[in-house]
Amino acid sequence: MFRKRNLVLDLLRRCYIETLIPRGLWSRTISTFPKSALLATDNAEMASKETGMFSLAGELASLVEESSSHVDDDSKPRSRMELKRSLELRLKKRVKEQCINGKFSDLLKKVIARPETLRDAYDCIRLNSNVSITERNGSVAFDSIAEELSSGVFDVASNTFSIVARDKTKEVLVLPSVALKVVQEAIRIVLEVVFSPHFSKISHSCRSGRGRASALKYINNNISRSDWCFTLSLNKKLDVSVFENLLSVMEEKVEDSSLSILLRSMFEARVLNLEFGGFPKGHGLPQEGVLSRVLMNIYLDRFDHEFYRISMRHEALGLDSKTDEDSPGSKLRSWFRRQAGEQGLKSTTEQDVALRVYCCRFMDEIYFSVSGPKKVASDIRSEAIGFLRNSLHLDITDETDPSPCEATSGLRVLGTLVRKNVRESPTVKAVHKLKEKVRLFALQKEEAWTLGTVRIGKKWLGHGLKKVKESEIKGLADSNSTLSQISCHRKAGMETDHWYKILLRIWMEDVLRTSADRSEEFVLSKHVVEPTVPQELRDAFYKFQNAAAAYVSSETANLEALLPCPQSHDRPVFFGDVVAPTNAIGRRLYRYGLITAKGYARSNSMLILLDTAQIIDWYSGLVRRWVIWYEGCSNFDEIKALIDNQIRMSCIRTLAAKYRIHENEIEKRLDLELSTIPSAEDIEQEIQHEKLDSPAFDRDEHLTYGLSNSGLCLLSLARLVSESRPCNCFVIGCSMAAPAVYTLHAMERQKFPGWKTGFSVCIPSSLNGRRIGLCKQHLKDLYIGQISLQAVDFGAWR
C-alpha cells in the first residue's frame, strides 16, 4: 500500500515540476527554500520510509500550498474595469453601514463627504479616461471638497461653466468642473448601491450584467412569440415637477436632507443634464450628465412596477372565466409563477394561455410586444401612455398604433431593426434553392446573349463608319448608294466622324420614338442585331427566358405541391431577427466624406493632416465598433462588404491623398503601415481573442457604460503645439503634454430615437468647432473606443 502511495506522490511531483518549468517557476521554487528546510524535508522523507509512516494528504496539501503561492505571486495585473469594480465595492461597504431598518441616512456627511470616497470616485473617472490610478495627481483638493460638503458650503454654481453655440440657435450647454464631476461620481455610486438592487428585471440599464446586448437578446426572443409590437419614445427635459417627483421617490429609501439640498443646487445650476429623449443614452455624449443614468432609472422604476400591474390585469385578471385561484390551471397562479421564474412548473393548461405581455426598457427607450388580440395591445399602450403622462409628467412623441409583428418590415429598437421572420421548412428551403439556381442560370444566359449581340453591334458600327469613309473616296464611292444621295445635306468642312454621329442620331430618333431605354447596349442589341438573328434562334432564347421567369415568380405553395409528401399541416416556426441599419450607415458614410453619392470610396479631406497611424486608428475604430455591435445581426455579411469594399479603400485613398501618390503605389511605399489597415476577419478574430483573454468585468455594460456604445467622432488638426503656445491633454486625470490641438466637428444630430451607425449621432451644436488638446495615446483611445467624449474636460481653456 505504501509503495502505491509513493508512486502516486512521485507522479504528482513530476506533473507539478512539468507545470512549473515552462513558466520559469521551478528555479524560483527551489531558491525560495532555505537549505536547512530542504535538508529537513529529505530527512523527514527518509524517516517516514524507515518507519513506514507516510501522510499522502499532507504531501498533497503542501504541493497545493506551494503552487497557490506562486500563482498569486505571478498573477496578471487587473484590468481597469476590475479596478473600477473593486473601487465601487469599497464604496458599497461604506454605504451599507448607513442602512438602518431598510433606510439609508446621512449618506452625504458620512460617506460622500469623505476624502477617501472622493478619491475613489476620482479614480473611477480616471479609469474611464484610461489613465493609470497609480499616478497621483494633485489637481483635485479632496480634503477641502470634503470639508465644504460636510459644512454645506460647497458652491455648485462656481464649479460649472457654460458653452454657447456659435450658430443661430445659441444653445447653451452647462458642464461641471472636475471637482464637481468627482462629487457627482461619488453620488452616482452611492445611489446605485441604494436603488439598483430594487430595480425591475425589465430594466436593462444601470444593472450589472444588463445592457444593450441583453435588451436586444430579450426582444429577439420574445418578438417571435408576439403578435403586436410598439415602442414608446419619451421626450421631456428635467423641470420642477419632474425633479420634485424624483426627490419624493428618493426619499422613500434615503433620509438625507443635505443630499437633497445638494441635488437641488445642481438642478438650479442646470448641471444635472438629465433629459428624457432628445439623444440616445449610453453613447458617451458630453450632454449626458454623470447622474443621468441613475436618476433616470430611479424615476422610471415607478413605470417598471406599473407595468407589472398592467401585465397582471390583462394576463391574470382578464375576462376569462377560469380565474379561480384554487384551480390547478389558474391564470393568476401561472402569472405569479412566471414572475418568480418557475418556468419548469408550467402545466399544459398554463402553456396554452394565449395572452402574454412583454416589455423591455433601456434607459428612456421602451419596447412592448403582445401575444393576443390588437384591442389588448391598444389598451396596454393607452394605459402605459396614461401613466407616463399623468403620474410621471413625461411627454410621448410617437403616437403610432401597435403594428403586427409579421406584416411590419421591422421595428427600430436601440438603433437597430428588429423583425419577426418565418423559419422555412426543409422543403421550402429546397424549393427556394432550386428557384435561385434557375434564376442565376437564366441571368447568366441573358448576360451572354446581350454581350454577344453588343459585340456584333459594335462591329456593325465599325462597318458603317468604314462605308462612310469609302463614300468620300472617288474611286470607291457609289453614286447610286444612299450615302451619296444624302451627302448633299453635309456641311462643307464637316469631319467624317461628326457626319457619322449626325446620321446615327437621326436614325436613333426615328427608331427609338417609343423606347425609354436609349443606352448604347440596348440600341445595338435590340434594334440592330436581334432583327437580323435567325427567327428560330431568337424564339428559342425568349422561350427559355419566359419559362425561367415563370418558374421563378411562381408561388412556393404551388411548387410544394410538386414535391413528394408535402408537410402543409405543420405550423410555421417564427424567430426574431436583428438587422443592422445598412441604409442609414451608407448615408452617414456619405455625410462623413468616406464615399461618393454613387457609393464609391473616396478620401477624407479632414483626416489628411493627421499622422498615418492616426488615420488608420480612425478607420480601425469604425470597423471595431461595427464588428462588436453587429456581429450577431443577420445581415452581418453586408457590414463585412462595407468594410472590405468601402472603408478599407477609403483609408487607402486618404493615405494616397496625404502623400500625393497613386493608390496603386501606396502599398509599395507603406507596406508595413498598410498591413495594419483593418479587415472584417482580422478585427473579428482580434475581438474574439480579447473576449477569451479579458475578464468578464471588461464586458459588463454596467461598468463600461458610456464606453462600449460610444460612437466615432471626427477631429481635424487645428495646429501644432509650440513652446510659445503650450497645451496639456484635455482628458481628465492626464498630465501629458498634447503635441497638437484638434477641432471637433458635429457632423449630425439625429432625432430621438436614432440609428446606431458607428458615429457620434448627436454631438451638441455648442461643441461644434470646439478645440481640444489630446496626447497621442488618448487620441488613439478616442478613435478606437477606449474612451468617450465624456472623458474630455472642455473647460480646460476657459
Swiss-Prot record:
One of its GO terms (biological process) is Group II intron splicing. It comes from the Eukaryota. The keyword Iron does not apply. A zinc finger (THAP-type) spans 729-778. GO terms for cellular component: chloroplast; mitochondrion. InterPro entries: Domain_X. Keywords: Chloroplast, DNA-binding, Endonuclease, Hydrolase, Intron homing, Metal-binding, Mitochondrion, Nuclease, Plastid, Transit peptide, Zinc, Zinc-finger. Disruption phenotype: Altered mitochondrial morphology. Impaired seed germination (e.g. many dark and wrinkled seeds in siliques), seedling establishment and development (e.g. abnormal primary root elongation and vegetative growth). Defects in the processing and maturation of various mitochondrial NAD1 introns. Modified respiration phenotypes associated with complex I defects. Seed-specific deficiency in the regulation of carbohydrate metabolism. Small plants requiring sucrose-supplemented medium to survive. Residues 578-665 are annotated as: Intron maturase type-2. One of its GO terms (molecular function) is RNA-directed DNA polymerase activity. Its EC number is 3.1.-.-. CDD domains: RT_G2_intron. Belongs to the plant nuclear intron maturase (nMat) family. This is Nuclear intron maturase 4, mitochondrial. It comes from Arabidopsis thaliana. The lineage of its organism: Eukaryota, Viridiplantae, Streptophyta, Embryophyta, Tracheophyta. The gene is NMAT4.
